[in-house]
Swiss-Prot record:
Positions annotated as active site in the UniProt record: H677
Gene responsible for this protein: FAO3
Protein name: Long-chain-alcohol oxidase FAO3
Subcellular location: Membrane
Domain of life: Eukaryota
Family, per entry: Belongs to the GMC oxidoreductase family.
Main location: membrane
Catalytic reaction(s) noted: a long-chain primary fatty alcohol + O2 = a long-chain fatty aldehyde + H2O2
Gene Ontology MF annotations: flavin adenine dinucleotide binding; long-chain-alcohol oxidase activity
SUPFAM superfamilies on file: FAD/NAD(P)-binding domain
Pfam families documented for this protein: FAD_binding_2 (PF00890), GMC_oxred_C (PF05199), GMC_oxred_N (PF00732)
């Protein structure tokens, strides 16, 4: 039974065999061995599906798969302390008769001694009923949340895992196959454009690190007094994403010696794999499984060289004029009303190689566009930082073709070309602050650099990077905790966190010869976002935008509502021809992140109403495009069969759409929100009461400490924010460069 041994965490003991038996019984109820529905094998389903693969998929039991250990390891490694403790408690209770009685009630009672069965002894039918009841349990919501954690971890591992050959036994049945043409490496796949300036600390020792730093032109020596490696430079930039890459480029090109710290790793196109599990694990914060504290949100944030720009879905949308007006006039931040900012957007647009057309749209974007056209709704092209012919559905796992021009292939290349050095596998621990003798601008402290640590266990010494100017660009989730851990106390640090909350609608479009409407491709193929529709209010204000997502099999299964084992398998069997539309709102509400990995956020009522409007419009679009069935991801499996349905029935269905938040909410029905955009948690403000940084991007408390990432934005943007983040960083870093190279105060 050692194969089940998984180390404990947060002071709890190792996972026991009894707990693993509870987990196996739970997972069997989630994905039981069942007979496939006759229509799945009779030819009435999708044409492309292999019938033998379907039989094998339906007969597979969740308790018999090798992913049980991976599932509990995922909760252990990626879950919050609340999720981990709740999961362990539930598995422990289900391994006992008394605990099973407390959770399962009368389902576990039998007429023979000892009159109560453990969860693993219950029949499959009883276990399924227990899950169904608990997913509706609006009183003991912590129990429900724990059930959700286990379900999410298991399904994600089951559908995203790959063997060394890049295979998963479930993929053929659900119609998922990686397109070799779409995912072939570029002709320059061996190119390492950052090689000249990269130092990968994970491959170094303390001695070789010193040699590598010196080879890159840096002054690096052992500081025995502080047991550190001391590195001197003009500017240190913490983070290499949309903001950090731009800042590094601008500052290096102005003749300054720049060091960039990146805790993630560097990958070239040929090193990317077009698979969800490995891609999320190596390129995203917390392996792509980053929940809010209460579990109501799943958050995606890049954690590699290039940051979010290396893994985003290529959308390049300029800051809306209405947002610029609000920021410049209502919030009194002049920058956003200047020619300086408009020029910055053009510079960014050009350097990113943005194109405004798409030669061939993906399955999902075809459906979005067709549905909008049939309804007379607005639909627009979404510019991308790729070629017009770029047809890649796996850019979120790193662009294997090298066509997408993220920061790692643009701004950082420029920076390295002008002498910048990038340290990967290197995490900033705190800023080096001292009392400001000059008290310039009323700032009590002055920043002298960063204390950082390599994630390589062979490098025990801290890295002390001494710099004239320090730029924090770790993103809206990491900049606030870093500033707080350094001793900064501005009340805005970590607050005003905007997430662009997302809910999704789906529509099933079977690939049938008899169908009058045919959309080419599959849900996971082609350009991810090439079309957008705006949801407008009666006075033409934008309430939400509708786009299309990248959903690998694992993510799709996590978001899909579970109502029974058979239903779950039927939904997954339709994966490749299920189109998803995402509703994104410019959130008026906000949350906070003051400790790394601890995201607190509650959706504002106005934002929920706008999400509801977007969901309803998404469903109408899917129906108008010819979907056979549509629905939402609400926990009760809300859906509508479209064949022969009349307008009254459609309207009744749309009226039932709701946006309740999270499994811990006191409602029977609930949703899991998503977020791929995080902003505003160290926002610019006209004074220290309104913002964490001043109008030039400098900390109100510490001289020479600047912020150049999405946390600096005054509020949510309402559209994909990459261009806004880069343009803001361009303006701030240009001002820094001017100040440093002229010796004049800004």
């Amino acid at each position: 039974m050692d194969k089940y041994k998984v180390a404990g965490k947060f002071g709890l003991p190792d996972i026991t065999v009894a707990e693993m038996e509870s987990l196996a019984s739970f997972c069997e109820a989630v994905l039981p061995s069942v007979q496939p529905p006759p229509e799945e094998l009779s030819g009435e389903g999708d044409n492309h599906r292999n019938k033998e693969a379907l039989r094998s998929f339906y007969s597979t039991s969740g308790s018999k798969t090798p992913v049980l250990r991976q599932s509990i390891e995922l909760v252990t490694k990626r879950g919050t302390i609340e999720a981990y403790i709740a999961t362990r408690l539930i598995l422990f209770l289900l391994a006992t008769r008394l605990g099973t009685l407390l959770i399962c009630g009368t389902e576990c009672l039998v007429s023979r001694w000892p009159f109560v069965e453990k969860f693993s002894e219950l029949s499959l039918e009883k276990r399924e009923r227990v899950l169904q009841k608990q997913f509706k349990n609006w009183i003991l919501t912590p129990i429900r949340a724990a059930f959700v954690y286990i379900k999410v971890a298991f399904l994600f591992c089951f559908f995203s895992r790959v063997n060394p050959n890049g295979e998963n036994p479930a993929w053929e049945a659900i119609g998922y196959r990686v397109n070799p043409d779409e995912n072939k490496p570029s002709e320059t796949h061996n190119e390492r454009p950052l090689e000249k300036g990269i130092v990968e600390t994970m491959e170094e020792t303390e001695q070789t690190l010193l040699e590598s730093l010196a080879h890159k032109g840096l002054e690096a020596v052992l500081d025995t007094e502080h047991d550190a490696i001391r590195i001197k430079c003009d500017v240190v930039v913490v983070g290499s994403g949309s903001g950090g890459g731009v800042a590094a480029s601008v500052l290096a090109k102005s003749g300054l010696k720049v060091v960039v710290l990146e805790k993630g790793s560097y990958f070239t196109p040929s090193e990317h794999r077009p698979f969800e599990g490995p891609g999320l694990d190596k390129l995203y914060e917390n392996g792509g499984i980053l929940p809010s504290v209460d579990g109501s949100f799943m958050v995606l944030a890049g954690a590699t060289v290039g940051g979010g720009s290396a893994v985003n879905w290529s959308a390049c949308i300029k800051t809306p004029k209405s947002v610029l007006q609000e920021w410049s006039e209502d919030q009194n931040i002049p920058l956003f009303g200047t020619k300086e900012y408009l020029t910055a957007m053009e510079v960014v647009w050009k350097r990113m190689g943005v194109t405004e057309k798409c030669e061939l749209e993906s399955f999902q974007n075809q459906i979005l566009r067709k549905g909008c056209e049939n309804l007379g709704f607005n639909v627009e092209n979404v510019p991308r930082n790729s070629s017009e012919s770029h047809y890649c559905g796996s850019c979120g796992y790193g662009c294997r073709q090298g066509d997408k021009k993220g920061s790692d292939r643009t701004w950082l290349v420029d920076a390295v070309g002008h002498g910048a050095v990038i340290l990967t596998g290197c995490k900033a621990e705190r800023f080096i602050l001292e009392k400001n003798g000059s008290n310039k601008g009323g700032k009590q402290m002055k920043c002298l650099g960063v204390m950082a640590k390599s994630l390589n266990g062979n490098i025990a010494k801290m890295l002390k990077i001494e710099a004239k100017v320090t730029v924090s660009a770790g993103g809206a989730l990491l900049t606030p905790p870093l500033m707080i851990s350094s001793g900064l106390r501005n009340r805005n640090i970590g607050k005003n966190l905007h997430l662009h909350p997302v809910l999704m609608a789906w529509g099933y479009f079977p690939d049938k010869e008899s169908s009058n409407i045919s959309f080419k491709g599959n849900s996971y193929e082609g350009g991810i976002i090439t079309s957008v529709s705006k949801v407008l209010s009666e006075d033409s204000e934008v309430r939400a935008i509708i786009e299309t997502p990248q959903l690998g099999p694992g993510s799709f299964s996590v978001l899909t509502p579970w109502t029974s084992g058979l239903d779950m398998k039927k939904r997954m069997a339709r994966y490749s021809r299920t189109a998803s539309l995402i509703t994104i709102v410019r959130d008026r509400g906000s949350g906070e992140v003051k400790t790394e990995g601890r995201i607190n956020y509650t959706v504002d009522k106005t934002d929920r109403d706008n999400l509801k409007a977007g969901l309803r419009e998404s469903l109408r679009i899917l129906i108008a495009a010819g979907a056979e069935e549509v629905g939402t991801h609400r926990s009760d499996g809300q859906r509508l069969i479209c064949k022969g349905v009349n307008e009254n029935s459609i309207q009744e269905f749309l009226d039932s759409v709701s946006t309740e938040e999270g499994a811990k909410g006191m409602t029977e029905k609930w949703n899991v929100y998503s977020s791929a955009h995080q902003m505003g948690s160290c926002r610019i403000g006209e004074n220290e009461k309104e913002g964490a940084i001043d109008l030039n991007g400098e900390s109100w408390e510490a001289e020479k400490l600047f912020v150049c990432d999405a946390s600096a934005l005054p509020s949510a943007v309402g559209v994909n924010p990459m261009i806004t983040v880069m343009s803001t960083a361009y303006c701030i870093s240009t001002r820094i460069a001017k100040s440093m190279t002229t010796g004049l105060s800004h």
